[in-house]
Design a protein with these regions (language model features):
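Structural boundary micro-motifs
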Residues: 1-137
């Protein structure tokens, strides 16, 4: 795996760490410990990936953007109205920086592949059963 791809994957996984993203780790023995397929990304495993060259074996299971349900599309669209409004000289402005963060956090929390990792071969397509809608906040 190239350094650029490792960087993209690392950045993506950092944002998904709080959301119990399911990852595939190719069966491999490291320091006498067997790592099996389909585990949840945790700080411990994340640390192990950082210290060992395991990036070639790690792939998160993500949902393609086109798998978003109509209800999810509406919820994602409604995030616009959650961004703070600032007023200046009689004009109203939304904080675009906060809006971008809201969108990325929402997409990460629902395990959507908003960076195109599936097409790049850095992630696997999640099955419908992997991430149930009732587990979202």
């Amino acid at each position: 795996m190239t350094q650029n791809k490792k960087t993209i994957l690392y950045i993506d996984l950092c944002g998904r760490l709080p959301y119990n993203t399911i990852i595939s780790v190719a069966e491999r023995v490291t320091d006498g410990e067997i790592l099996w397929n389909d585990t949840t990304l945790t700080p411990y495993l994340f640390y192990r990936f950082a210290e060992d060259d395991m990036w070639d074996y790690v792939k998160p299971y993500l949902r393609p953007m086109d798998s978003m349900s109509p209800e999810e599309m509406q919820e994602h669209k409604d995030l616009y109205y959650q961004a703070p409004i600032y007023r200046s000289n009689g004009n109203a402005y939304r904080d675009v920086r906060k809006l971008e963060t809201l969108h990325i956090d929402w997409l990460n929390s629902r395990h959507f592949d908003h960076r195109g990792l599936i097409e790049a071969g850095l992630a696997l397509k999640a099955t419908d059963e992997m991430y149930k809608e009732d587990c979202y906040d």
